Amino acid sequence: MQPQGIGRNMIENKAQLLADLAYIGSKVQAKTNVYLFSGAAFQWHGLKDITKDIDICCSYEEADRIVSMLRMFGKMESVTGINDIHFLRIFLKSFTLQIFIKEVWMGDEYQLLEAAHCDSLTFGGITFLIPDIKTLLMIKDRQIQALYNEWKKLKGETCT
């Protein structure tokens, strides 16, 4: 649930996405590399018109640098998602940033990010690495499989 009065709820186009990435980068001056994935990355590649938030993945140290600079500009919460994946969510003035930490997030997906050909955008101290479409689809496929397995567990069925 989004705090009242914070956020516009959706990132409606690539220009808005770039402005939001620039905002994050303007607050973090220390050299930091993060992977942009999920909806925002699909939007970057022109495969999605609107996305609800910006998802990034990085090391614990890089997440700490980002959180220490952004927490004063918005409300932060810790979230437990599908398969007990923990991540941080920061509600900023006009958008929501979700941070998945390499050491907490599932390693296979992070290895896919590390092996991917990536576009890169640098704003302030942050370089946003945007994986190729094939890698994004492979990660999305794994997320769908995890959702399916969770559904099967809820129904009491065996996962394969």
In which residue ranges do the predicted regions lie?
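Active-site nucleotide-donor binding segment shared across nucleotidyl transfer reactions
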Residues: Y23-I54, C58-Y60, R65
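A general structural motif
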Residues: K31-T32, S94, C118, G125
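Conserved catalytic core of two-metal-ion nucleotidyltransferases
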Residues: G74-D108
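Catalytic cores of NTP-dependent nucleotidyl/adenyl transfer enzymes across multiple folds
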Residues: G107-T160
